[in-house]
Amino acid sequence: MNYLLVDTCVLSDMMRQYNPCLPNAGFVEGVFLKKNMLRMINSVVQDMDGTSGYIVVSAFAFLELINKFSDIFKEEISKKIMSLNRIIATIQQPPSWMIIEETNLETAKEFCQVPNAIGTGEHISADDAVHIATALQRGDDITLLTTDHVLKQLNLQRISVVTD
């Protein structure tokens, strides 16, 4: 089973394109959705029998989208093609290929295991650390799809990182 955890930026591109009336429609490249990520995501989303895997999203990523909604989706809001209700509806009834992981005490415990910096000394932000902690709390091998190239240097068991 393939588990793909998306960060907030990748999730924002997915939400720009997601149509609940066509939940298995593939995504296209966007600002943050890059070629390799896209191939991996579409292999899950377009799998009609649901056996290839899941897109995992931390509840925290949705909180970030809601908190920064008017900045992240400024263009879509002006064109009236995105609303906060759409984000909330996705949280309340996610597509069959999406798992929304709670941010809870287990996340906090795993957060303590995330290093503050990578080997080069570059800092790992608290936001990124929450996404990493979410990946760790699952206990499965998981691929983190992120826009943060610093995380490509991360060396943690069970987590691989894709930035393109």
Language model features: what each stretch is:
Residues 1-60, 72-82:
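Short, well-structured N-terminal submotif of metal-dependent ribonuclease cores
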Residues 10-14, 67, 80-98, 103-111, ...:
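Anionic, Ser/Thr-rich low-complexity intrinsically disordered regions
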Residues 66-70, 136:
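Short, amphipathic alpha-helical segments that act as regulatory/interfacial helices
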Residues 50, 71-75, 93-97, 117-120:
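General structural signal for alpha-helix termini and helix-helix connectors
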Residues 1-5, 18-30, 132-164:
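Acidic, PIN/NYN-like endoribonuclease modules and their adjacent C-terminal/linker elements
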Residues 96-143:
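Active-site neighborhoods of divalent-metal-dependent phosphate/nucleic-acid chemistry enzymes
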